[in-house]
Amino acid sequence: MSDSEDPSDEVQYHVAVGPDDIADAVLLPGNPERVDKITALWDGYDERAEHREYRTATGTYEDTPISVTSTGIGSPSTAIAVEELARVGAETFVRVGSCGAIQPEMDVGDLVITAGAV
């Protein structure tokens, strides 16, 4: 197992959170401003960290613990967030936000579930 796969009880450099800061499930918007929109729907929450494009809050939704961490734009910054959050205990990640599509059968507002990426 490489160092990047080892569980850690230390605060992670980029996302600036440790194991006590996040829930098992984490929503991942790109824009840090979307953290406010997401947490407004929750029962309650606490801001846990903000560093560069990464902003994290943890709370509950219908009595279920949940976290949100913004990732910034693009796959590299998202990969950093997922790897560091996994190191401190997050197990489930759901990317939320907007995207574009070149398929003519897709309309604005369609739910898109990615099955793979290149």
Model-derived regions: residue spans:
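Metabolite-binding pocket within alpha/beta catalytic cores that recognizes anionic/polar moieties
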Residues: S2-V118
